């Protein structure tokens, strides 16, 4: 489906949920994904199925800066002065680079698939040990921001999440309804306006 088609599917699902309709269950046979009592999947988006999404988390990182170079330098006073000045410049660059890398920023990860349920968002994320499922409970979401095909979720106790891709507006519509209920239109105003004008 095209990006435009995915957008209109998001508008359609937003309108359906706003009118009180219930989404049907989507079968999911994924090892590691264990739904809670009463929880069921309503959408599955896999890179291999033609619905790729990108995934990033916003946080600071621990960066270790290690001094390199010889411990003992021998030479004329001019050579030693030049060496010390050059070393100071290189160390300054290395410290600035380490600070830049350690600063809070969006840090992307590989994302294999995303499952949207009635209670949580599940993401199969690439780690150093392969792929691992992480989930985000809707009741922990304090802010949902949809800008085009990018969704930013802010949580009570964990770092923010950024998803991007053609099907992200659909995910945003569903998450907004399960998290905010009747106030969902306030969380996804673009979808709500589009739903009002298309009906």
Regions found by a protein language model. Give the residues of each.
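Mid-length scaffold segments of soluble, non-membrane domains
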Residues: 114-116
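Acidic, Ser/Thr- and proline-rich intrinsically disordered linker/docking segments
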Residues: 3-23, 28-42, 47, 53, ...
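Short, hydrophobic/aromatic-rich segments at coil-to-beta transitions
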Residues: 118-120
């Amino acid at each position: 489906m095209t990006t435009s088609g995915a957008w209109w599917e998001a508008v359609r699902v937003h309108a359906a949920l706003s009118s009180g309709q219930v989404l049907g269950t989507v079968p999911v046979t994924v090892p590691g994904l264990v739904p809670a009592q009463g929880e069921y999947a309503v959408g599955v988006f896999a890179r291999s199925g033609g619905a790729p999404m990108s995934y990033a988390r916003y946080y600071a990182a621990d960066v270790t800066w290690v001094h390199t170079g010889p411990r003992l330098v021998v030479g004329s006073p001019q050579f030693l002065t030049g060496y010390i000045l050059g070393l100071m410049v290189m160390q300054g660059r290395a410290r600035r680079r380490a600070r830049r890398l350690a600063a809070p920023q969006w840090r992307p990860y590989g994302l294999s698939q995303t499952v949207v349920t009635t209670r949580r968002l599940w993401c199969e994320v690439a780690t150093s040990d392969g792929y691992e499922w992480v989930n985000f409970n809707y009741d922990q979401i304090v802010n949902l921001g949809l800008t085009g095909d990018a969704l930013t979720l802010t949580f009570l106790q964990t770092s923010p999440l950024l998803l991007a891709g053609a099907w992200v507006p659909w995910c945003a519509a569903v998450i907004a309804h399960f998290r905010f209920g009747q106030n969902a239109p306030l969380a996804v105003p673009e979808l709500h306006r589009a739903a009002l004008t298309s009906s």
